[in-house]
A protein has these predicted regions:
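A short, contiguous, amphipathic alpha-helix enriched in charged residues
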Residues: 94-114
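Structural alpha-beta junctions
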Residues: 11-12, 43-48, 109-121
């Protein structure tokens, strides 16, 4: 996990892991990628679904224009190292025009896009409901 996160995340800033369990969502700030990995393993061991932010942030939290404390906002975004895509798959997503019916179709479209734009081969993660591409 550390190699993956190091390859897609910037080398500076505040990082976030998000945990979800029984409908409750919580952000956990981390100062290093090593700390992110440790926190992700800890939360996973306690039955949480664990996600990560694809950018780093300037601060652990900030006060927005409405006086509310916020964490992972565009205003607080610090750095990004990579581009990322979340490609949804499934018959319902395809019927709504919001994704591809099957993974094979999504991979073919992704390959055509990469060739057309001239991007390097990405890291592809099968997310369960589609593809995460970095």
């Amino acid at each position: 996990m550390k190699n993956f996160l190091t390859s897609i995340l910037p080398g500076q800033g505040v990082y976030f892991i998000t945990s979800i369990k029984a409908g409750a969502c919580r952000n956990h700030s981390c100062r290093t990628i090593h700390e992110m990995v440790r926190k992700a393993h800890e939360l996973d061991a306690h039955g949480y679904d664990v996600f990560f932010a694809c950018a780093s942030f300037k601060e652990e939290s900030h006060i927005d224009a409405d006086g509310k404390r916020r964490q992972r906002t565009g205003e607080n975004a610090g750095c990004a190292k990579s581009f990322w895509l979340d490609i949804d798959c499934g018959p319902d997503k395809a019927a709504e025009g919001k994704g591809y019916a099957i993974i094979k179709e999504a991979l073919a479209a992704l390959q055509a896009f990469i060739i057309a734009v001239g991007l390097p081969m990405p890291i592809i993660v099968f997310s369960g409901g589609g593809l995460h591409v970095y």
